[in-house]
Amino acid sequence: MSWVCRFYQGKHRGVEVELPHGRCVFGSDPLQSDIVLSDSEIAPVHLVLMVDEEGIRLTDSAEPLLQEGLPVPLGTLLRAGTCLEVGFLLWTFVAVGQPLPETLQVPTQRKEPTDRLPRSRLGVGLGVLSLLLLLTFLGMLGHGLWREYNQDGQLVEQEVRRLLATAAYKDVVLTSPKEGEPWLLTGYIQDNHARLSLQNFLESHGIPFRLELRSMEELRQGAEFILQRLGYHGIEVSLAPQAGWLQLNGEVSEEIQKQKIDSLLQAEVPGLLGVENKVRIAGNQRKRLDALLEQFGLDSDFTVNVKGELIELRGQVNDEKLSSFNQLQQTFRQEFGNRPKLELVNVGGQPQHDELNFEVQAISLGKVPYVVLDNHQRYPEGAILNNGVRILAIRRDAVIVSKGKREFVIQLNGGKPR
Protein backbone atom coordinates (compact mmCIF):
# COMPACT_ATOMS: atom_id res chain seq x y z
CA MET A 1 0.00 0.00 0.00
CA SER A 2 1.19 3.53 -0.78
CA TRP A 3 0.46 6.71 1.16
CA VAL A 4 -0.18 10.34 0.28
CA CYS A 5 0.07 13.36 2.62
CA ARG A 6 -1.31 16.91 2.60
CA PHE A 7 -0.08 20.10 4.29
CA TYR A 8 -2.49 22.55 5.95
CA GLN A 9 -0.52 25.73 6.66
CA GLY A 10 2.41 27.75 5.39
CA LYS A 11 3.66 28.18 1.83
CA HIS A 12 2.77 24.59 0.94
CA ARG A 13 -0.81 24.69 2.21
CA GLY A 14 -3.03 22.42 0.13
CA VAL A 15 -0.10 20.57 -1.49
CA GLU A 16 -0.48 16.78 -1.71
CA VAL A 17 2.59 14.53 -2.05
CA GLU A 18 2.89 10.75 -2.37
CA LEU A 19 5.37 9.45 0.21
CA PRO A 20 8.24 7.25 -1.02
CA HIS A 21 8.78 3.92 0.70
CA GLY A 22 11.73 3.67 3.08
CA ARG A 23 13.30 6.50 5.08
CA CYS A 24 11.49 9.74 4.26
CA VAL A 25 12.72 13.13 5.49
CA PHE A 26 10.71 16.38 5.67
CA GLY A 27 12.91 19.48 6.00
CA SER A 28 14.21 22.73 4.54
CA ASP A 29 17.64 21.38 3.45
CA PRO A 30 17.30 20.08 -0.14
CA LEU A 31 20.44 17.97 0.23
CA GLN A 32 19.10 16.05 3.25
CA SER A 33 15.34 16.06 2.65
CA ASP A 34 13.14 13.92 0.40
CA ILE A 35 10.28 16.43 0.75
CA VAL A 36 11.58 20.02 0.87
CA LEU A 37 9.53 22.64 2.76
CA SER A 38 10.64 26.27 2.39
CA ASP A 39 8.88 27.87 5.39
CA SER A 40 11.32 29.62 7.75
CA GLU A 41 9.90 27.72 10.73
CA ILE A 42 10.93 24.35 9.26
CA ALA A 43 14.24 22.87 10.47
CA PRO A 44 16.81 21.48 7.96
CA VAL A 45 15.74 17.96 9.03
CA HIS A 46 12.30 18.56 10.56
CA LEU A 47 10.66 15.13 10.52
CA VAL A 48 11.97 11.63 9.74
CA LEU A 49 9.55 8.80 8.94
CA MET A 50 9.84 5.16 7.96
CA VAL A 51 7.27 4.38 5.25
CA ASP A 52 6.23 0.87 4.18
CA GLU A 53 3.12 -0.95 3.01
CA GLU A 54 1.89 -1.47 6.59
CA GLY A 55 1.98 2.21 7.49
CA ILE A 56 4.16 5.10 8.61
CA ARG A 57 6.33 5.12 11.74
CA LEU A 58 7.94 8.06 13.50
CA THR A 59 11.75 7.80 13.44
CA ASP A 60 12.87 11.27 14.54
CA SER A 61 11.65 14.87 14.69
CA ALA A 62 13.06 18.31 15.46
CA GLU A 63 10.09 18.98 17.78
CA PRO A 64 7.65 16.57 19.49
CA LEU A 65 5.11 15.07 17.10
CA LEU A 66 1.52 15.44 18.31
CA GLN A 67 -1.25 13.16 17.03
CA GLU A 68 -4.68 14.61 17.82
CA GLY A 69 -2.94 16.71 20.48
CA LEU A 70 -1.12 13.79 22.15
CA PRO A 71 2.67 13.31 22.04
CA VAL A 72 3.84 10.30 20.03
CA PRO A 73 6.88 8.22 21.12
CA LEU A 74 9.55 7.29 18.57
CA GLY A 75 8.78 4.11 16.67
CA THR A 76 5.00 4.57 16.93
CA LEU A 77 2.85 3.61 13.94
CA LEU A 78 0.88 6.75 13.03
CA ARG A 79 -2.89 6.64 12.37
CA ALA A 80 -4.05 7.67 8.92
CA GLY A 81 -6.40 10.63 8.65
CA THR A 82 -5.50 12.12 12.05
CA CYS A 83 -4.28 15.63 12.82
CA LEU A 84 -0.46 15.54 12.98
CA GLU A 85 1.67 18.46 14.22
CA VAL A 86 5.43 18.94 14.43
CA GLY A 87 5.85 22.53 15.55
CA PHE A 88 4.75 24.67 12.60
CA LEU A 89 4.20 21.65 10.35
CA LEU A 90 0.51 20.64 10.23
CA TRP A 91 -0.33 17.61 8.08
CA THR A 92 -2.09 14.28 7.71
CA PHE A 93 -1.95 11.26 5.43
CA VAL A 94 -4.20 8.57 3.95
CA ALA A 95 -3.80 5.60 1.63
CA VAL A 96 -3.49 6.48 -2.06
CA GLY A 97 -6.96 6.63 -3.58
CA GLN A 98 -8.70 7.73 -0.37
CA PRO A 99 -9.88 11.34 0.03
CA LEU A 100 -7.84 13.74 2.15
CA PRO A 101 -9.72 16.18 4.43
CA GLU A 102 -9.92 19.77 3.19
CA THR A 103 -9.22 21.10 6.69
CA LEU A 104 -7.90 19.71 9.95
CA GLN A 105 -9.52 20.26 13.32
CA VAL A 106 -6.58 21.18 15.56
CA PRO A 107 -7.18 20.36 19.25
CA THR A 108 -7.38 23.63 21.22
CA GLN A 109 -6.21 22.00 24.46
CA ARG A 110 -3.42 19.47 24.80
CA LYS A 111 -4.38 16.43 26.84
CA GLU A 112 -2.12 14.28 28.91
CA PRO A 113 -1.45 10.87 27.38
CA THR A 114 -3.31 9.13 30.21
CA ASP A 115 -5.97 10.26 32.66
CA ARG A 116 -4.66 10.66 36.15
CA LEU A 117 -6.74 9.29 39.00
CA PRO A 118 -6.74 10.97 42.44
CA ARG A 119 -4.23 9.40 44.74
CA SER A 120 -4.94 8.66 48.34
CA ARG A 121 -2.45 9.56 51.03
CA LEU A 122 -1.83 5.85 51.61
CA GLY A 123 -0.97 5.42 47.93
CA VAL A 124 1.44 8.34 48.05
CA GLY A 125 3.13 6.90 51.13
CA LEU A 126 3.54 3.50 49.51
CA GLY A 127 4.99 5.15 46.44
CA VAL A 128 7.57 7.08 48.47
CA LEU A 129 8.53 3.93 50.38
CA SER A 130 8.97 1.98 47.14
CA LEU A 131 11.12 4.75 45.72
CA LEU A 132 13.39 4.74 48.79
CA LEU A 133 13.84 0.97 48.58
CA LEU A 134 14.68 1.23 44.88
CA LEU A 135 17.25 3.99 45.48
CA THR A 136 18.88 1.93 48.23
CA PHE A 137 19.14 -1.08 45.95
CA LEU A 138 20.59 0.97 43.11
CA GLY A 139 23.09 2.57 45.47
CA MET A 140 24.39 -0.86 46.48
CA LEU A 141 24.81 -1.96 42.89
CA GLY A 142 25.76 1.39 41.39
CA HIS A 143 29.53 1.10 41.50
CA GLY A 144 29.65 -2.33 39.88
CA LEU A 145 27.07 -1.45 37.24
CA TRP A 146 28.89 1.77 36.34
CA ARG A 147 32.19 -0.05 35.88
CA GLU A 148 30.49 -2.67 33.69
CA TYR A 149 28.82 0.11 31.68
CA ASN A 150 32.16 1.78 31.08
CA GLN A 151 33.69 -1.48 29.87
CA ASP A 152 30.77 -2.11 27.51
CA GLY A 153 30.96 1.47 26.23
CA GLN A 154 34.65 1.10 25.42
CA LEU A 155 33.99 -2.11 23.49
CA VAL A 156 31.19 -0.48 21.50
CA GLU A 157 33.40 2.53 20.71
CA GLN A 158 36.09 0.16 19.42
CA GLU A 159 33.52 -1.49 17.12
CA VAL A 160 32.40 1.89 15.80
CA ARG A 161 35.97 2.99 15.11
CA ARG A 162 36.65 -0.29 13.26
CA LEU A 163 33.62 0.41 11.06
CA LEU A 164 34.81 3.97 10.39
CA ALA A 165 38.20 2.61 9.30
CA THR A 166 36.57 0.90 6.28
CA ALA A 167 36.63 2.55 2.84
CA ALA A 168 32.95 3.58 2.96
CA TYR A 169 33.49 5.72 6.09
CA LYS A 170 37.14 6.82 5.73
CA ASP A 171 36.07 10.49 5.69
CA VAL A 172 33.84 10.26 8.80
CA VAL A 173 35.16 11.57 12.14
CA LEU A 174 33.89 10.38 15.54
CA THR A 175 34.08 12.89 18.37
CA SER A 176 34.53 10.97 21.63
CA PRO A 177 31.34 11.51 23.61
CA LYS A 178 31.23 13.20 26.99
CA GLU A 179 29.10 11.79 29.77
CA GLY A 180 25.41 12.29 29.04
CA GLU A 181 25.96 13.56 25.49
CA PRO A 182 25.23 11.75 22.20
CA TRP A 183 28.03 10.58 19.94
CA LEU A 184 28.79 13.10 17.20
CA LEU A 185 29.81 11.86 13.75
CA THR A 186 30.83 14.41 11.13
CA GLY A 187 32.33 14.28 7.64
CA TYR A 188 31.44 12.89 4.22
CA ILE A 189 29.93 9.66 2.88
CA GLN A 190 29.28 8.57 -0.70
CA ASP A 191 25.48 8.33 -0.60
CA ASN A 192 22.43 7.96 1.64
CA HIS A 193 22.74 4.17 1.61
CA ALA A 194 25.99 4.52 3.60
CA ARG A 195 24.24 6.94 5.97
CA LEU A 196 21.38 4.50 6.57
CA SER A 197 23.76 1.57 7.16
CA LEU A 198 25.71 3.59 9.74
CA GLN A 199 22.51 4.73 11.42
CA ASN A 200 21.20 1.15 11.67
CA PHE A 201 24.52 0.00 13.14
CA LEU A 202 24.45 2.67 15.86
CA GLU A 203 20.79 2.05 16.68
CA SER A 204 21.34 -1.71 16.95
CA HIS A 205 23.99 -1.05 19.64
CA GLY A 206 21.72 1.32 21.55
CA ILE A 207 24.08 4.25 21.02
CA PRO A 208 22.71 7.81 21.34
CA PHE A 209 24.13 9.67 18.36
CA ARG A 210 23.93 12.76 16.17
CA LEU A 211 24.91 12.57 12.49
CA GLU A 212 26.25 15.66 10.75
CA LEU A 213 27.23 13.94 7.51
CA ARG A 214 27.21 15.19 3.94
CA SER A 215 26.57 12.82 1.06
CA MET A 216 28.95 13.32 -1.88
CA GLU A 217 26.21 12.22 -4.27
CA GLU A 218 23.89 14.87 -2.79
CA LEU A 219 26.62 17.49 -3.29
CA ARG A 220 26.95 16.44 -6.94
CA GLN A 221 23.20 16.50 -7.53
CA GLY A 222 22.86 19.87 -5.80
CA ALA A 223 25.61 21.44 -7.91
CA GLU A 224 24.19 19.92 -11.10
CA PHE A 225 20.72 21.26 -10.29
CA ILE A 226 22.03 24.79 -9.66
CA LEU A 227 24.11 24.86 -12.86
CA GLN A 228 21.22 23.62 -15.00
CA ARG A 229 18.85 26.12 -13.41
CA LEU A 230 21.25 28.94 -14.35
CA GLY A 231 21.63 27.69 -17.91
CA TYR A 232 25.08 26.05 -17.71
CA HIS A 233 23.96 22.96 -19.64
CA GLY A 234 27.41 22.27 -21.10
CA ILE A 235 29.05 21.56 -17.72
CA GLU A 236 29.40 18.05 -16.30
CA VAL A 237 29.70 17.59 -12.51
CA SER A 238 31.61 14.63 -11.05
CA LEU A 239 33.18 13.72 -7.70
CA ALA A 240 36.75 14.86 -7.08
CA PRO A 241 39.21 12.54 -5.27
CA GLN A 242 39.12 14.71 -2.11
CA ALA A 243 36.14 14.48 0.25
CA GLY A 244 33.86 17.50 -0.03
CA TRP A 245 35.20 18.52 -3.47
CA LEU A 246 33.58 18.37 -6.91
CA GLN A 247 35.13 18.38 -10.39
CA LEU A 248 33.68 20.36 -13.30
CA ASN A 249 34.25 19.67 -17.00
CA GLY A 250 32.76 21.22 -20.11
CA GLU A 251 32.68 24.61 -21.84
CA VAL A 252 31.48 28.15 -21.18
CA SER A 253 31.58 31.11 -23.52
CA GLU A 254 33.50 33.59 -21.36
CA GLU A 255 36.28 33.56 -18.74
CA ILE A 256 34.12 35.61 -16.34
CA GLN A 257 31.53 32.80 -16.29
CA LYS A 258 34.18 30.22 -15.38
CA GLN A 259 35.38 32.36 -12.47
CA LYS A 260 31.84 32.90 -11.15
CA ILE A 261 30.98 29.19 -11.07
CA ASP A 262 33.37 28.36 -8.21
CA SER A 263 32.10 31.03 -5.82
CA LEU A 264 28.50 30.39 -6.85
CA LEU A 265 28.59 26.69 -6.01
CA GLN A 266 30.46 27.15 -2.73
CA ALA A 267 27.83 29.69 -1.65
CA GLU A 268 24.80 27.66 -2.77
CA VAL A 269 25.76 24.03 -2.03
CA PRO A 270 25.91 23.34 1.75
CA GLY A 271 28.96 21.32 2.77
CA LEU A 272 30.93 21.90 -0.45
CA LEU A 273 34.61 22.51 0.43
CA GLY A 274 35.97 23.29 -3.03
CA VAL A 275 35.77 22.87 -6.79
CA GLU A 276 38.30 21.51 -9.29
CA ASN A 277 37.28 23.71 -12.19
CA LYS A 278 38.40 22.13 -15.46
CA VAL A 279 35.84 24.03 -17.53
CA ARG A 280 37.21 25.27 -20.86
CA ILE A 281 36.50 28.55 -22.62
CA ALA A 282 34.82 27.90 -25.97
CA GLY A 283 37.20 28.64 -28.86
CA ASN A 284 40.36 28.40 -26.77
CA GLN A 285 41.25 25.01 -28.25
CA ARG A 286 41.39 26.39 -31.80
CA LYS A 287 43.52 29.37 -30.75
CA ARG A 288 45.89 27.09 -28.87
CA LEU A 289 46.09 24.67 -31.81
CA ASP A 290 47.08 27.50 -34.18
CA ALA A 291 49.83 28.51 -31.75
CA LEU A 292 51.10 24.92 -31.49
CA LEU A 293 51.14 24.49 -35.28
CA GLU A 294 53.32 27.58 -35.52
CA GLN A 295 55.50 26.42 -32.62
CA PHE A 296 56.21 23.04 -34.26
CA GLY A 297 56.62 24.54 -37.75
CA LEU A 298 53.51 22.88 -39.18
CA ASP A 299 51.31 25.94 -39.76
CA SER A 300 51.97 25.94 -43.51
CA ASP A 301 51.73 22.15 -43.91
CA PHE A 302 48.22 21.41 -42.66
CA THR A 303 44.71 22.73 -43.09
CA VAL A 304 42.40 22.54 -40.06
CA ASN A 305 38.87 21.13 -40.33
CA VAL A 306 36.69 21.24 -37.18
CA LYS A 307 33.89 18.64 -36.95
CA GLY A 308 32.32 19.07 -33.50
CA GLU A 309 34.49 17.11 -31.05
CA LEU A 310 36.90 16.14 -33.86
CA ILE A 311 39.63 18.36 -35.35
CA GLU A 312 41.23 17.07 -38.56
CA LEU A 313 44.68 18.19 -39.68
CA ARG A 314 44.94 17.51 -43.42
CA GLY A 315 48.19 17.52 -45.37
CA GLN A 316 51.05 15.52 -46.81
CA VAL A 317 52.98 13.61 -44.15
CA ASN A 318 56.55 12.41 -44.03
CA ASP A 319 58.47 10.97 -41.09
CA GLU A 320 59.71 14.36 -39.89
CA LYS A 321 56.25 15.94 -39.99
CA LEU A 322 54.73 12.89 -38.33
CA SER A 323 57.20 13.19 -35.44
CA SER A 324 56.33 16.88 -35.02
CA PHE A 325 52.62 16.11 -35.17
CA ASN A 326 52.96 13.44 -32.46
CA GLN A 327 54.63 15.98 -30.15
CA LEU A 328 51.94 18.55 -30.94
CA GLN A 329 49.18 16.01 -30.29
CA GLN A 330 50.70 15.03 -26.92
CA THR A 331 50.89 18.68 -25.81
CA PHE A 332 47.33 19.37 -26.95
CA ARG A 333 46.03 16.27 -25.15
CA GLN A 334 47.74 17.28 -21.89
CA GLU A 335 45.99 20.65 -21.98
CA PHE A 336 42.54 19.68 -23.25
CA GLY A 337 42.19 15.91 -22.79
CA ASN A 338 40.47 13.90 -25.53
CA ARG A 339 37.76 16.47 -26.19
CA PRO A 340 38.24 17.60 -28.89
CA LYS A 341 40.28 14.84 -30.51
CA LEU A 342 43.06 15.63 -32.98
CA GLU A 343 43.18 13.43 -36.08
CA LEU A 344 45.82 13.43 -38.82
CA VAL A 345 44.64 12.96 -42.41
CA ASN A 346 47.44 12.15 -44.88
CA VAL A 347 46.28 13.38 -48.29
CA GLY A 348 49.56 12.50 -50.00
CA GLY A 349 48.77 8.80 -50.64
CA GLN A 350 50.37 5.92 -48.80
CA PRO A 351 53.42 6.60 -46.60
CA GLN A 352 56.79 6.03 -48.20
CA HIS A 353 58.22 3.65 -45.57
CA ASP A 354 55.06 2.00 -44.34
CA GLU A 355 53.03 0.64 -47.23
CA LEU A 356 49.50 -0.08 -46.02
CA ASN A 357 48.21 -2.16 -48.95
CA PHE A 358 44.63 -1.45 -47.84
CA GLU A 359 42.19 -1.25 -50.78
CA VAL A 360 38.56 -0.77 -49.73
CA GLN A 361 35.94 -2.14 -52.12
CA ALA A 362 32.85 -1.44 -49.99
CA ILE A 363 31.68 -0.70 -46.45
CA SER A 364 28.64 -1.67 -44.37
CA LEU A 365 27.36 0.48 -41.48
CA GLY A 366 24.86 -2.03 -40.14
CA LYS A 367 24.62 -3.38 -36.60
CA VAL A 368 28.18 -4.72 -36.97
CA PRO A 369 30.08 -2.35 -39.32
CA TYR A 370 32.62 -3.97 -41.65
CA VAL A 371 34.72 -3.25 -44.75
CA VAL A 372 35.19 -5.40 -47.84
CA LEU A 373 38.76 -5.34 -49.17
CA ASP A 374 40.14 -6.26 -52.59
CA ASN A 375 40.37 -9.92 -51.48
CA HIS A 376 36.54 -9.89 -51.12
CA GLN A 377 36.81 -10.65 -47.37
CA ARG A 378 34.80 -8.83 -44.71
CA TYR A 379 36.67 -7.23 -41.79
CA PRO A 380 34.83 -5.69 -38.78
CA GLU A 381 36.16 -2.99 -36.45
CA GLY A 382 39.06 -4.34 -34.40
CA ALA A 383 40.16 -6.85 -37.04
CA ILE A 384 43.91 -7.24 -37.77
CA LEU A 385 45.08 -8.03 -41.30
CA ASN A 386 48.00 -10.30 -42.19
CA ASN A 387 50.20 -7.27 -42.93
CA GLY A 388 49.67 -5.90 -39.39
CA VAL A 389 47.06 -3.27 -40.25
CA ARG A 390 44.36 -2.93 -37.54
CA ILE A 391 40.92 -1.51 -38.36
CA LEU A 392 40.09 1.05 -35.65
CA ALA A 393 36.84 2.62 -36.88
CA ILE A 394 34.52 2.51 -39.88
CA ARG A 395 32.65 5.70 -40.79
CA ARG A 396 30.54 6.71 -43.74
CA ASP A 397 33.26 8.99 -45.09
CA ALA A 398 36.43 7.24 -43.92
CA VAL A 399 38.08 4.14 -42.46
CA ILE A 400 40.59 4.70 -39.65
CA VAL A 401 43.40 2.15 -39.40
CA SER A 402 46.72 1.80 -37.62
CA LYS A 403 50.01 0.13 -38.33
CA GLY A 404 52.65 0.05 -35.65
CA LYS A 405 52.36 3.30 -33.70
CA ARG A 406 50.88 5.27 -36.60
CA GLU A 407 47.24 5.95 -37.42
CA PHE A 408 45.85 6.66 -40.88
CA VAL A 409 42.51 7.92 -42.15
CA ILE A 410 41.53 6.48 -45.53
CA GLN A 411 39.00 8.84 -47.11
CA LEU A 412 36.06 7.24 -48.95
CA ASN A 413 33.75 8.36 -51.70
CA GLY A 414 30.59 6.30 -51.93
CA GLY A 415 32.28 3.44 -50.08
CA LYS A 416 35.48 3.53 -52.21
CA PRO A 417 38.81 5.18 -51.39
CA ARG A 418 39.70 8.49 -52.96
Swiss-Prot record:
Report if keyword Chloroplast is assigned. Answer: no
Q: Where in the cell is it found?
A: Cell inner membrane
Q: Where are the transmembrane segments?
A: 122-142
Q: Does the keyword Cytoplasm apply?
A: no
Induction description: At 37 degrees Celsius in the absence of calcium.
Primary location class: membrane
The disulfides recorded in the entry are none
Q: Which UniProt keywords apply?
A: Cell inner membrane, Cell membrane, Membrane, Plasmid, Transmembrane, Transmembrane helix, Virulence
A single GO cellular-component term from the record reads: plasma membrane
Describe its membrane topology: Single-pass type II membrane protein
- Known InterPro entries for this protein? SMAD_FHA_dom_sf, T3SS_YscD/HrpQ, YscD_cytoplasmic_dom, YscD_ppl_1st, YscD_ppl_3rd, YscD_ppl__2nd
Instruction: Tell me the domain of life.
Output: Bacteria
Q: What is this protein's function?
A: Required for the export process of the Yop proteins.
What's the protein here called?
Yop proteins translocation protein D
Supply the gene name: yscD
